[in-house]
Amino acid sequence: MDTYELVVPCHFGLEAVTKREIYDLGYEITRVEDGRVTFAGDAEAICRANIFIRSAERVLLQVGRFRATTFDELFEGIKALPWEDYIPKDGKFWVKKASSIKSKLFSPSDIQSIAKKAMVERLKNVYRLNWFPEDGAPYPVRIFLLKDEVMVTLDTSGDSLHKRGYRLMTSKAPLTETLAAALIMLTPWKKDRILVDPFCGSGTFPIEAAMIAANIAPGMNRQFTAEQWKNLIPKQLWYDTVEEAQDLMDADIQVDIQGYDIDAEVVKAARENAKRAGVDHLIHFQKRAVADLHHPKKYGFVITNPPYGERLEEKEDLPELYTQIGQAYAGLDSWSLYMITSYEDAERYIGRKADKNRKIYNGMIKTYFYQFMGSKPSKRREAAEKTIERKEQQ
């Protein structure tokens, strides 16, 4: 089976999370760059990466890399790539997207047009055709230019991998599923600890946490462009990967995951989303304000995405809101708080400085992932709690 260079775009600042996921799948990392991780893998790896990696935006198959500072060099570089190894005679191929950063060639539309012409020229010569029907499987191409280095890829995923298939209803400021999963995996939260999101919105943090706890693969209930690439990936590999994912699931696990919001309609939407994700039985959703956040359990986790106040009229409410977050957190003995927000004065109104602070881009918005660490349970206490939990489950 052929080995490919597979490129996994991810959120800037969270490459280490994606890298760990790829390692856990058993693959060798070949390159780590800002916002993407590259690894070596075969056709089966394409299936497994799409279905299992939680933090990936998509999985790209690298066709080639070369330098280009003129459109002639771009044309010749793309024409020199072995497109016939990937695209059959009836394949539908087009340049889905082109991006350019700090490069002499900067017009995406021109890059797309020239790249398509170069691909056609190559395939005309190889297949001895003057016209392509393009009525077969789709082969979308994505091209990236960075400092005059061109990376040419085929998109195996299709829709972005944050589209798990469960979120039909969204709140006003939704967090993508891939970012939520990556942030959860960045924390030390484990499934034996309570997790609460007091600003749950459409339920993304609680749902992703429940899927992690139950080991439900994020791509089990969606389709991918490369499923149609019968010339590269046997259909059986997709069936086998889904079967592997089903075997690894533990949907009967006992966890304590809770999501609150002050909007009853939003809470209803979160419940519906959780039901579609198959984890509604693992999450308790409730209409509740952050000021009412309290819990008798110790060593819990608050992981949340509070309002940022991106609109001017909302900014006036932020000092009071973040003061309430700080007061609620102060009453949670031994708990940890993990919070993503773009609000620059978050620490000031929460009333303490974060133990860690990581800059992350949520789309085009620069945000901060504040990490307030609670105390850890002693090993003796942890062992005793697990014994009690096992007895309760019997």
Model-derived features with residue positions:
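Conserved S-adenosyl-L-methionine
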Residues: 175-295, 310-311, 317
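A short, flexible beta-alpha/helix-coil linker loop
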Residues: 100-103, 160, 307-311
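Non-catalytic nucleic-acid substrate-recognition regions in nucleic-acid-modifying enzymes
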Residues: 2-139, 391-394
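C-terminal catalytic and target-recognition region of SAM-dependent MTase-like enzymes
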Residues: 289-394
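Flexible, glycine-/basic-rich loop-and-beta segments that form/coincide
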Residues: 48-55, 159-164, 168, 374-394
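SAM-dependent Rossmann-like transferase core, predominantly class I methyltransferases
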Residues: 152-186
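C-terminal edge-of-domain segments
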Residues: 141-157, 370, 379
